[in-house]
Amino acid sequence: MTFSVQETLFSLLRLNGISGHESSIANVMQHAFEQQAKDVWRDRLGNVVARYGSDKSDALRLMIFAHMDEVGFMVRKIEPSGFLRFERVGGPAQITMPGSIVTLAGCSGDIMGCIGIKAYHFAKGDERTQPPALDKLWIDIGAKDKADAERMGIQVGTPVTLYNPPHCLGNDLVCSKALDDRLGCTALLGVAEALASTPLDIAVFLVASVQEEFNIRGIVPVLRRVRPDLAIGIDITPSCDTPDLQDYSDVRVNHGVGITCLNYHGRGTLAGLITPPRLLRMLETTAHENNIPVQREVAPGVITETGYIQVELDGIPCASLSIPCRYTHSPAEVASLRDLADCIRLLTALANMSPEQFPIDPETGATQEARP
């Protein structure tokens, strides 16, 4: 079977799943994993885990993960007029909300809607140039009143996702909602396909995780069951090749996988990852040996599950691979199929390494300690 990066990515992008509502994506991931993996399970929180490679109890355990959920909204109140008030789930870009088309997961099926905006003809002053506060926004589904909205299947708690089906742009770029992080999910499936018939010296656990966009900790139950020796996350990172960001960093689309040196959220002390130098060397050496382009990144304002994984159990060495993405958390994110394919190649090369090539121990550079 030939793995198609574009077809797989587009099929995942057409699915909807805000944090806590990832089941449609999880079903696809689980079914795909079950075709070749030695063991597959879904935990009570919704994480999907697949095991490949060595069955030995003392085998080095590499965990590779990406999150299934996307940013979106949830209905907070149905107005008597039938318009819907809502809250953000995760961090969708508020500046892009007015005028956006959305999909609501109604009780009887999906319902289309749009986020209303004051008629430009009647807008005055800042109303014409500044995005309204969240409590000034509403969703219009065409309901004539509250009872009509309820008959259409809407209730408090109805999940809402941005609507923008995937499109191809020039130079192997794609535009869609939810590239964060269906790119990573696609990478997991690409690695799964590559490992299906390959004997490995290590145990590889591929994890499609939940609730990253909401609390960044949905993957924690998996760690405590798998107990990995090393974890590598796959996520997007802001591409800085647009006119507004080109002076900020050199990370750009179509120039390879990003290797995170540093990321953090908030003011730097809340959570983040400083990748151990020995892991940076391992990633860059492996990429060089396999002619895979990579680019280093320092990304303040970005955080992934690695910020919390690293302090679990006895400490878990972590690294992050990033796929550069323009217009993050908007309805129209843009990323490169080439970069995604390179990410799959690098992860596959890592999975095929021998245990001795993984620098687990910080003092000696040794591999994992013998398991009790």
Curated annotation (Swiss-Prot):
Its EC number is 3.4.11.-. A divalent metal cation 1 binds at H67, D180, D235. GO terms for biological process: proteolysis. The active site is at E212. Its cofactor is a divalent metal cation. A divalent metal cation 2 binds at D180, E213, H329. GO terms for molecular function: aminopeptidase activity; metal ion binding; metallopeptidase activity. It is an enzyme of class 3 (hydrolase). Keywords: Aminopeptidase, Hydrolase, Metal-binding, Metalloprotease, Protease. Binds 2 divalent metal cations per subunit. InterPro entries: Peptidase_M42, Peptidase_M42_aminopept, Peptidase_M42_dom2. Belongs to the peptidase M42 family. This is Putative aminopeptidase SgcX. It comes from Salmonella typhi. The gene is sgcX.
